């Protein structure tokens, strides 16, 4: 197995960036989801409510990042705001302190989304813990939904696409790491995995939501797939019934991909790096064959 693609998403729920290598930090890959759009009260925005967020491009520049949207031009976003304005923000059930960016940037993003919003940045001293079930005392995460990284294999997507009338691209699932050379759903059973010179441990498989039904190139919802098909063979009660209580996964959760926590902070991983499963769960699950 090896890494075939590395993706980072500097601003939560905006378009991702494919990179050749990335530095592994405690809270995830460098730059990944360190910025986020919220309402003025600090509640997070995602494509679930604003699917057109998928159309905003982001890139890395010296001293910060850039963003662009058709019809709205470009914006430069410094890593830290020039005027410091710290505010608590909310991602699901967790709260964390963040720096609010300038009124000019907030107005630009408000125009792009067609709703009042603000851009915030997670500073280095902010601490947002992962789910307590998987926290060994010092595990933190960026503005990602719950865990520092998510990996998905090409074979798992190929298996799904074999069941769909129209194949879907990998960007529907927004993984950080795409794995080539694995069997379909091999990532389900990872406990510990080594990538290049870095080691990661799994938390629980990724529970999929309606964002997977958004056409990332159009910024629009596109029917009920792939959730409808995934629900036929990837519900937790069917995939790993013996692990539900331990992992804290609901029996009807739709699973696709694996969440990871880094144990090798400071390492650099690159496209082409080998991927070795050091420790795996024993499983009796056999993927449902395509009809």
Regions found by a protein language model. Name each.
Residues 1-291:
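Metal-cofactor-dependent catalytic cores
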């Amino acid at each position: 197995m090896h890494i075939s693609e590395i993706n980072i998403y500097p601003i939560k729920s905006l378009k991702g960036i494919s990179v050749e290598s990335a530095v592994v930090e405690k809270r995830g890959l460098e730059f990944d989801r360190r910025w986020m759009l919220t309402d003025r009260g600090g509640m997070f925005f995602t494509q679930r409510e604003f699917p057109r967020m998928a159309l905003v491009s982001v890139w890395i520049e010296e001293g910060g990042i850039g963003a662009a949207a058709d019809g709205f031009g470009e914006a430069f976003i410094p890593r830290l705001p020039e005027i410091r304005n710290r505010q608590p923000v909310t991602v699901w059930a967790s709260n964390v302190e963040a720096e609010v960016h300038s009124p000019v940037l907030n107005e630009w993003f408000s125009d792009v989304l067609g709703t009042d919003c603000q851009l915030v940045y997670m500073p280095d001293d902010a601490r947002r813990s992962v789910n307590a079930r998987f926290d060994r005392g010092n595990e933190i995460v960026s503005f990602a939904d719950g865990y520092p990284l998510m990996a998905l294999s090409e074979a798992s997507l190929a298996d799904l696409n074999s069941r769909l009338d129209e194949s879907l691209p990998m960007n529907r699932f927004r993984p950080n790491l795409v794995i080539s050379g694995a069997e379909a759903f091999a990532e389900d059973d990872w406990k510990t995995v080594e990538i290049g010179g870095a080691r990661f441990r799994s938390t629980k498989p990724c529970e999929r939501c309606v964002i997977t039904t958004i056409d990332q190139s159009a910024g629009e919802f596109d029917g009920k797939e792939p959730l409808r098909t995934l629900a036929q063979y990837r519900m937790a009660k069917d995939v790993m019934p013996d692990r539900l209580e331990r992992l804290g996964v609901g029996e009807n959760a739709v699973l696709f991909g694996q969440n990871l926590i880094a144990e090798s902070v400071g390492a650099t991983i690159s496209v082409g790096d080998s991927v070795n499963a050091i420790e795996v769960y024993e499983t009796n699950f056999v993927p449902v064959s395509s009809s």
